[in-house]
Structures are given as C-alpha cells and as structure tokens.
C-alpha cells in the first residue's frame, strides 16, 4: 500500500526529527530528506505537502542552503519554519533582515484566525521563538498572519498557492496549540487523510518480509532491548520458526534480566532462542581493565565473536535482522533507503560472516512508534517500555575494574532502588533511574564494628528526550528507605549517595 507522504526538508535545524514526529502523530507518514534533494526526486514521491525546517544559516550568507524556486510552482502546499520561513520570503522576492533584538524563548503572539493555518486556535497565545533574522517585507501576493511585540511578520501565507511561513516553532511543546497548527497544515491545507496506522504498518511489513525471505533462515541478535525485541517479534510473525534469535548473556545484565528475556520470547512467543552463557569469557577479557572506552571496545569485540560462533553453527544463513530505527537512519546521513538492503557484512561484524541482506523492519519508525508496534504485537509492557540500558550493561556502571563480586553487589543495589521507585509509583515520572558502584571505599560503623566498604551512587533523572536532563526530586522518605535497605541487606556497601547533577554539565551515565 502506498501511503500519502509529507516530506520534511532538513536545513540543519535541531528540531527536524521533532517536526517529523509531530506529523506522524497526526497519522500522516513523513520522511526527512536533505534540503538539496533533486526536485525530480521530490516530485516523483507525489507529496501531499512539504515542510522546510529551521537552521543555523542566514539567507544572505554565501553558502546558505537554498532550494530550487521551481518547487514553488508545482502546486504542492509548503510550510516554512524559522529559517524555512525566511527562505520562502527571500526566494519569492521579499526582504529578510537582521533583528535589533534576538527573540529566544516563549513569546506572546497574535494570530489571524481567519487563516486556515490558524483555524480553531485562540487569537492570542504563546509561541516559542529562536531567531536572529526576520522577514521585514513580504513577497507579492503574501499576507501577514501573525505578529509578536518584536516581530511584525511572525507568520505569513498565500491561500491560493498554499504556501505559508512561520517564524516560531510549532513543533515544540512550548508553543501553545503548536500541534493544532501542524494538524491544520496537514488536513486543512494539504488535504491529508491520516492513513498512517500501526496496524497497517505491521501487516505491510509482515507481507514484505515474507516476500523477501521466503522459506530461508534468518538470524537475529536479541538483546532484550526495545528495538531488537520488536524487530524480532515482527520478523517472527512473518516467518515463524525460520527465525533464530541468539541471546548472548555476557553476565553484565541486571538482576533477573536474562531469565526474563528467554522466558518472554521462548515461552510466550514460542521463538527459537539460543541462549549463550558467556559470562566467564567476558569477565576474563575485562580483567584488569578500568578505562570505560576500553571496556566498551572489549565487550563489543567479544559480543561479535560469540555471535559469529553461534551463527556459524546454524549453517548457511543469508539474512540478519537489525533493530535500526529512523533516527539512526537520519543521523547517519544516509537518508531514505529501502527497508531491506543488500550488504556484504554487518557494520561492526567481522567479514568472517557474509550476510546477503540485512532486514531492518523498523527503519521507518521513531522510538515511540516502535513501542506502539511492540504493544500491538503483544510484547509485555515491561519490555516495550524498558528504560534505556547501555549495550555494555553494568560494566559501565561499575567504576574501575569489573569483577563478579562487584557485579553481584551492583545487581542487588540496583534491584532495590528500581523496586522502591516502582512501588512508590514514580516509575512513570522518572526518565531513567539506576545505581552506580563507585570505586571509592569509606569508613563506617555497623554493629559496633568498623567497616571499610563501597560507596554506591543512585542516579535518577527527568527528561523528554534524553538530550538534556534534570535530576529527579525524589522525596526524602523514599531515598531514606532505599538507603536503609541497601546498607542493611547488601554486603560490602556502607554508604549511599544521590547524584544531583543535571545534564549538562554531567551525562546521564557515569561512564
């Protein structure tokens, strides 16, 4: 089935993926393409509309990103945001100037609510501005549609040509009614129908995978994370027992995690899950290593070797499943590519294994869409809504050398912290929460005896997307319960500290 599509042309703005997500949330499929995509390719997709993103450039800079003026003559509805707004005005014959006062942050705005772009929203509202340049004079045929105190043309449009520009950012949550403005563009102006549904995506992918794979075997590296789990279940729905999932237990997972992964996919979905106990191998390779980057490299190398050994035992397998998602595609600069593409070998895998093709069933989806697909496929919420967990696992939540004793300590501490957060009902309010075993020991007193044991750190943050984060204001009584249980039930720990550093300057993980 060919979905209606809206194309987001990327001019280097920080919110390009957010714009695409907002469009998808309206049930309209969209893709992010480079601004210099040839006009013929854009036209060939027959888009219902085009959105120009913001960007750091000024239209008057020598190498400022531009667009073919002919695009405006094709009858395709266009919405320019921030730089995209200035670009439309500049190319169409208006004037863009440098503002005396830079507008940044929340700003009061007045809309012309007779415009189809602002239909159904209050005349006075709040928007999010982030600009230095502004449209001073409109091109012929355009009308001002909004204004702020410092920007007399905060939006403009031509209803006949269906070309519009907004100086503010409707895609960010700080703009009141921003989503409604995007909906108006999609449904009032582009005449979209909203045919992008999770259920139709699953059906289409299942049929596509069946056609490509046929009766051949497929292998998948299953980590228990959201992306690999959803990809595996989706492919299994298509080809059943011809899918072989290799789950490498490197001994660096949280308490009960390995058993849970095997139980869910083997018992609930009746999938071929090959569990490889490689704990001793990984610990031996990590012996004496304290540098976090070196830990990552060693774990990655050993994982590849173990996966390779197990995959070879399965015989001639031509297909590998990867949990690539759309942000990976966009950030790699690859742009749109086929869902299933030919490769000589997998990025990161040695050339000892040569897969004919990689199956990436989720490469068109954002993370929130992946979660929705997972829920529709029947994957338990505890896996679908799992918090971000680093590939190297607990190895980078142990500061210094990784040993079996330290892993046992951290598993118990982390389990106590996570259990208390969940029982307190805070798990849906906190973006991520976990424990870190520091390499610091301190003096304590327990049972009238002197102790000299480890200090553990608790880390909990609130965030929207993980790019920035604030430390979570967990009530003192909950922290007190966690601390008491840890020092009373976990041997070799006598001190608990709480990390109250935001990101930036700190990162969420310690290593």
Curated annotation (Swiss-Prot):
InterPro entries: Class_I_gatase-like, GATASE, GMP_synth_C, GMP_synth_GATase, GMP_synthase, GMPS_ATP_PPase_dom, NAD/GMP_synthase, Rossmann-like_a/b/a_fold. Its EC number is 6.3.5.2. ATP binds at residues 223-229. It catalyses: XMP + L-glutamine + ATP + H2O = GMP + L-glutamate + AMP + diphosphate + 2 H(+). Residues 196-386 form the GMPS ATP-PPase domain. GO terms for molecular function: ATP binding; GMP synthase activity. Pathway: Purine metabolism; GMP biosynthesis; GMP from XMP (L-Gln route): step 1/1. The active site is at 82 (nucleophile), 169, 171. Keywords: ATP-binding, Glutamine amidotransferase, GMP biosynthesis, Ligase, Nucleotide-binding, Purine biosynthesis. Pfam families: GATase, GMP_synt_C, NAD_synthase. Residues 5-195 form the Glutamine amidotransferase type-1 domain. Gene3D superfamilies: 3.30.300.10, 3.40.50.880, HUPs. The keyword Disulfide bond does not apply. The keyword ATP-binding applies. CDD domains: GATase1_GMP_Synthase, GMP_synthase_C. One of its GO terms (cellular component) is cytosol. Homodimer. NCBIfam families: guaA_Cterm, guaA_Nterm, PRK00074.1. Catalyzes the synthesis of GMP from XMP. This is GMP synthase [glutamine-hydrolyzing]. The gene is guaA.
């Amino acid at each position: 089935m060919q979905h209606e599509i809206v194309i987001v042309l990327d001019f280097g703005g920080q919110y390009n993926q957010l714009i695409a997500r907002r469009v998808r949330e309206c049930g309209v499929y969209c893709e992010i393409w480079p601004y210099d995509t040839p006009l013929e390719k854009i036209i060939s997709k027959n888009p219902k509309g085009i959105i120009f993103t913001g960007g750091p450039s000024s239209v008057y800079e020598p190498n400022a990103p531009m667009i073919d003026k002919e695009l405006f003559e094709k009858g395709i509805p266009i919405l320019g945001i921030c730089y995209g707004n200035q670009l439309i005005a500049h190319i169409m014959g208006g004037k863009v100037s440098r503002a005396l006062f830079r507008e940044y942050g929340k700003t009061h705005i007045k809309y012309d609510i007779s415009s189809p772009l602002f239909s159904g929203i209050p005349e006075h509202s709040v928007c999010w501005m982030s600009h230095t340049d502004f449209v001073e004079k409109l091109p012929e045929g355009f009308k001002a549609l909004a204004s702020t105190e410092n920007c007399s043309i905060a939006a403009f449009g031509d209803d006949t040509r269906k070309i519009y520009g907004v100086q503010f950012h409707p895609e960010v949550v700080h703009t009141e009614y921003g989503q409604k403005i995007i909906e108006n563009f999609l449904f009032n102006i582009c005449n979209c129908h909203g045919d992008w549904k999770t259920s139709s995506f699953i059906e289409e992918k299942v049929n596509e995978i069946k056609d490509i794979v046929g009766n051949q075997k497929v292998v998948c590296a299953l980590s228990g994370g959201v992306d690999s789990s959803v990809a595996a279940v989706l492919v299994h729905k298509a080809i059943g027992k011809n899918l072989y999932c290799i789950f490498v237990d490197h001994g660096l997972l949280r308490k009960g995690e390995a058993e849970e992964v095997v139980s869910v996919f083997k018992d609930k979905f009746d999938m071929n899950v090959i569990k490889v106990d490689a704990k001793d191998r990984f610990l031996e390779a990590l012996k004496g290593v304290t540098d976090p980057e070196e830990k990552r490299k060693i774990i990655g190398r050993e994982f590849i070797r173990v996966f390779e050994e197990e995959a070879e035992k399965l015989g001639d397998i031509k297909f590998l499943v990867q949990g690539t998602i759309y942000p990976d595609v966009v950030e790699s600069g690859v742009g749109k590519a086929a869902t299933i593409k030919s490769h000589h070998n997998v990025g990161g895998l040695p050339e000892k294994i040569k897969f004919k093709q990689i199956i990436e069933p989720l490469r068109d989806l954002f993370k929130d869409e992946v979660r929705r697909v997972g829920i529709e496929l029947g994957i338990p919420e505890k896996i679908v809504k799992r918090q971000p967990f680093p590939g190297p696992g607990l190895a980078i939540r142990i500061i210094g050398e990784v040993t079996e004793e330290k892993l046992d300590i951290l598993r118990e501490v982390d389990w106590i912290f996570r259990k208390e957060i969940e029982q307190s009902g805070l798990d849906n309010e906190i973006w991520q929460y976990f424990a870190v075993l520091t390499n610091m020991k301190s003096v304590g007193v327990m049972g009238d005896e002197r102790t000299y044991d480890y200090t553990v750190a608790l880390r909990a943050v609130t965030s929207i997307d993980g790019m920035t984060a604030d430390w979570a204001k967990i009530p003192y009584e909950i922290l007190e319960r966690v601390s008491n249980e840890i020092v009373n039930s976990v041997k070799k720990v006598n001190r608990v500290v709480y990390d109250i550093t935001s990101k930036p300057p700190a990162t969420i993980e310690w290593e």
